[in-house]
Amino acid sequence: MSDEKKCPVTGRTSSQVAGSGTSNKDWWPNQLNLNILHQHSAKSDPMGKDFNYAEEFKKLDLEALKKDLFELMTDSQDWWPADYGHYGPFFIRMAWHSAGTYRIGDGRGGAGSGSQRLAPLNSWPDNVNLDKARRLLWPIKKKYGRKISWADLMIFAGNCAIESMGLKPFGFAGGREDIWEPEEDIYWGDEDTWLGDTRYSGDRKLDNPLAAVQMGLIYVNPEGPNGDPNAVASGKDVRETFARMAMNDEETVALVAGGHTFGKCHGAGDAANVGPDPEGAPIEQQGLGWKSKFGSGKGGDTISSGIEGAWTPTPIKWDNSYFDTLFGYEWNLEKSPAGAWQWHPSDPEAKKAVPDAHDPSKTHPPMMTTADLSLRMDPIYAPIAKRFHENPEEFADAFARAWFKLTHRDMGPRARYLGSMVPDEELIWQDPVPAVDHELIDNTEIADLKAKILASGLSISKLVSAAWASASTYRDSDKRGGSNGARIRLAPQKDWYVNQPLQLPELLNKLEEIQQHFNSKSGNKKVSLADLIVLGGCAAVEQGAKNAGFDVTVPFTPGRTDASQEQTDVHSFAVLEPAADGFRNYQKVKYSVTPEELLVDKAQLMTLTAPEMTVLIGGMRVLDANFDGSKHGVFTDKPGSLNNDFFSNLLDMDTVWTSTSEDAELFEGRDRESGELKWSATRIDLIFGANSQLRAIAEVYGCEDSGEKFVNDFISAWDKVMNLGIF
């Protein structure tokens, strides 16, 4: 290589820069990915550590922002003209595709972080040309700056779009904070080509936790399963996909019909004319992708999904014309100019029904996608669609509510909602808990209650396990779960196998006795069972530390309340049941991924760092908090004592480990010289000695002088977990 091609400073070739070259992942593809525990650090956030988005949002004049957005709707720009002179449908699609990545399986995806701005979502095939929607919003974002995040602005723009076209939204809540780097924890599928669908196995069984049918799609393939224009089969895909996004059949029909009341699809020409996506586009395009060589590349020449046309004759007006069109014609299968399957009315007069989006001298027939026709052909969807057709007000309310759910589902409880447009109505999918209506216990009463709990006969193991079971349901992905509400005493959580439903009532009954005795006293000072469950765990941790020679106080903040069964959607909460909980050495069945990968996944959902995950495992083991009393990983002869024995014994070179199961998931540790059996372990336990990064952390806690640090770090991580979901 000539000198001209080398860096003039270092003499290196252009490929020899920091971060390049063969990576650890290249050498060891199956290496445990701990990077997902350390995403979104302050080093990537330009806003600074003192920035408080909630406080900034309170300064926002939401009505002024709404006025500016309404004006933008009809301010068509030559560089990207508005269809029908109105950007409303475009912004609805942007907001929908921001929120529509949410899936209930792990709570990941959704609109809560503004991730549509970043790879891979900014370049998904289903998001073609939404980069222009965000650029249209830039002048408004520029004006309001830090007072509104991109995440909130995209959703609010969708709300304003709906209202500007004639339907009052159910409400809007702010509070979504932007991220500044792509989310590495989200499993979008393992396909290596856009629109690949190896996520299916057997009889079209979709891989969990995925919801979309193909890589790079938000929902279903609008042309039908794998492009097969079969409306009945498409209905099955629609049902599964929307169900995995927390929508029932009525909500699904309302969303599809309501969303497709507005706007049009774009498939004016061959997709081969379209250039690379934003991430692959040349630098001079400044983050805009999909530059098209077809005609003007915009307006009437736009190519996006490949499907071409509008659903209704009134694409920028809220009305019932979607159902009028769906049920008013018989439909013929045809191909768009881009070669995509779509349906047109058999009636030739329909060719005059829809105005052109840019040329008033032209008209077109309405179109339906195969997915649209599933609302007419599916035996469950069809009666719902007909009822909505006959009852426009019911349809309008159903769509407004479903849209609110779609765009707010991943925000968690109402306590996180910000702004003057938050609806008053409490909704079951928000996982409501009662407001605090009593005086909270003080430090003296906390100490007294701790003593009563420890004197009740409940063991350290049981108290720690119960508190963990209550709090560790939290997942930060959609801000659900946690100790608030004490739902461990309600269906479905009380019956989860991991919570040992045969033993759980004894503990809950004793805590309820203590609660009732305390609350029967005069005055307005009360304690909830939710608080007592956590307090019991804290008392047990304190006792464990005392047993190890450390006199500590575990932090405790009261204020949790007890939810009722009526406030708890059993079906909705079922998805929070842990398939595995490595902190309790529990795994329901054998999975295709390793137990240690499942541990890291759960730790990420609980916002734990690698050091926090490590110290919690070590503490939970010596506190004897394993599922069903298992002794795997209890590397101590003093269970119930919060010491660093787990680490010192794991790192002991006098122990030799061998697998005792064909799948290498259970192990025994024997004395290197005598062969005497010392310990048993799972992969979860041994990964802290096998993985180089985790071993480095384990060595910190395995040192002879680390006892106090271990206790303090465990308490800090424990307190963090106990307060997850408290907003």
Curated annotation (Swiss-Prot):
Region (Disordered): 1-26, 346-365
E.C. number(s) listed in UniProt: 1.11.1.21
Crosslinked residue numbers (Tryptophyl-tyrosyl-methioninium (Tyr-Met) (with W-96)): 219-245
Gene Ontology process terms (BP): cellular response to hydrogen peroxide; hydrogen peroxide catabolic process
GO CC annotation terms, alphabetical: cytosol
Function of the molecule: Bifunctional enzyme with both catalase and broad-spectrum peroxidase activity.
Recorded family membership: Belongs to the peroxidase family. Peroxidase/catalase subfamily.
Name of the protein: Catalase-peroxidase
Organism (species): Maridesulfovibrio salexigens (strain ATCC 14822 / DSM 2638 / NCIMB 8403 / VKM B-1763) (Desulfovibrio salexigens)
Gene that this polypeptide is encoded by: katG
